[in-house]
């Protein structure tokens, strides 16, 4: 089976031939953790993503460009230093990445951190990935113009239709396999064996939520409330609310009557953002939303439903502990009011990832996380930052995962 070489762009190639090329020693010697050859390539790639024309068309790529700036890279690498002379850190070797098709820029984060850790990488880009992924591949290939030859010799991105034989070939050669996707696809890939020393790093289905403090909302300025609506819009609508960190349920915490007033205002402000951004939901999605929301009501999960045009639907949840974790369609928000933040705890499960918050103090949130004690929720972020990728993701410190330690205790 011939694979389409996306980066570096080249003739179609078979998996075995690609592995033979990538396992040769690169010019200038093997890559090291924090290798200058990779850093200089990543910063040049970041500049291409931050170019106004690209950032305007795909705003999500601007945050990727920001993540890969030299200062950010230095910060990430600084967290790696163990300050222990007897512990040396090295790359794992060959890392095989299988990213999801629905959030088509996530592969760049996991690839970039793995390359920064000094690994050779093979990334499968889904044939279904769309505009933003194409823009990323173009920017990567443009950045090659001034790159060290070691980049081409150690980093590959390919596209092929689902093919277990090809995936098995890459899996058998890998020292680490990184799988993003739904639970089913993670389990399918896991059936393909790895070398005995190798392991998987999995990012399966996750659910995320948003929480607003009723008192915090009341105390906030009109400007801060508007900004909260814009942040919530970015968190929810950028990837059609399908990203693992986009909120699926909105909680209000505090007095129920005041919460009603807050909800009305929030819905109005969000509606204004939707109009300002020209958010258009296609007819198929509008139908999907109605089917899934009426389905939730029929199942007794929701007690009432409200549509504000096709772009915004809100549902009242019957039980604060029975949460809707599946995707109901772009711009569909089940809501529930809780008396206290601690009432959220019984509802949280291991698969719950991001909590986007507005109007709480840091101490309140640390108290919540301590009460959760690891049963779920890997990150707590302000509105507008749900989709901001970080080198610690799903509870993993990725640079640590992408490296291995050798100790010299003599």
List where the protein language model places each region.
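Short hydrophobic alpha-helical runs that function as membrane-insertion/retention elements
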Residues: 121-125, 178, 356
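N-terminal Rossmann-like NAD(P)+-binding subdomain of aldehyde/semialdehyde dehydrogenases
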Residues: 1-92
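Conserved NAD(P)+-binding/catalytic subdomain of aldehyde/semialdehyde dehydrogenases
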Residues: 149-256, 392-410
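Donor nucleotide-activated moiety binding/catalytic core segment of transferases
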Residues: 79-96, 102, 160-168, 313-330
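Short, well-ordered alpha-helix to beta-strand connector turns
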Residues: 92, 173-174, 247, 351-352, ...
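Conserved small-residue-rich beta-alpha loop and adjacent elements
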Residues: 80-144
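NAD(P)-dependent aldehyde/semialdehyde dehydrogenase
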Residues: 239-356, 366-367, 372-373, 381-400, ...
């Amino acid at each position: 089976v011939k694979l389409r070489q996306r980066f570096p762009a080249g003739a179609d190639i078979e998996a075995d031939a690609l592995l033979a090329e990538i396992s040769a020693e690169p010019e200038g010697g093997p890559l090291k953790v924090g290798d200058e050859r990779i850093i200089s390539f990543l910063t040049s790639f970041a500049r291409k993503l931050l170019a106004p024309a690209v950032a305007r068309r795909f705003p999500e790529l601007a945050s990727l460009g920001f993540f890969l700036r030299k200062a950010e890279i230095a910060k990430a690498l600084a967290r790696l230093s163990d300050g222990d002379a007897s512990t040396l850190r090295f790359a794992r070797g060959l890392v095989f990445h299988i990213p999801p098709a629905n959030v088509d820029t996530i592969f760049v984060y996991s690839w970039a951190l793995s390359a920064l850790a000094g690994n050779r990488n093979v990334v499968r880009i889904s044939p279904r990935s769309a505009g933003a992924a194409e823009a990323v591949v173009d920017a990567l290939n443009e950045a090659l113009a001034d790159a060290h030859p070691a980049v081409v010799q150690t980093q590959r991105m390919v596209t092929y239709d689902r093919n277990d034989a090809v995936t098995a070939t890459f899996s058998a050669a890998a020292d680490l396999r990184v799988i993003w996707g739904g639970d089913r696809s993670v389990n399918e890939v896991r059936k393909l064996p790895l070398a005995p020393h190798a392991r998987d790093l999995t990012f399966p289905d996750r659910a995320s939520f948003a929480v607003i403090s009723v008192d915090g909302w009341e105390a906030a300025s009109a400007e801060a409330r508007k900004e909260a609506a814009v942040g919530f819009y970015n968190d929810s609508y950028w990837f059609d609310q399908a990203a693992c960190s986009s909120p699926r349920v909105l909680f209000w915490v505090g007095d129920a009557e005041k919460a009603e007033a807050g909800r009305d205002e929030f819905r109005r402000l969000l509606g204004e953002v939707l109009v300002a951004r020209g958010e258009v939901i296609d007819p198929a999605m509008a139908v999907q939303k109605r089917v899934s929301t009426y389905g939730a009501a029929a199942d007794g999960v929701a007690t009432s439903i409200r549509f504000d045009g096709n772009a915004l639907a809100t549902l009242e949840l019957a039980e604060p502990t029975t949460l809707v974790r599946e995707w109901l369609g772009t711009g569909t928000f089940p809501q529930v009011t809780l008396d206290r933040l601690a009432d959220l705890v019984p509802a949280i499960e291991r698969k719950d990832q991001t909590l986007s918050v507005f109007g709480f103090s840091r101490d309140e949130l640390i108290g919540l996380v301590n009460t959760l004690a690891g049963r779920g929720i890997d990150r707590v972020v302000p509105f507008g930052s749900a989709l901001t990728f970080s080198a610690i993701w799903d509870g993993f410190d990725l640079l640590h995962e992408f490296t291995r330690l050798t100790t010299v205790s003599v």
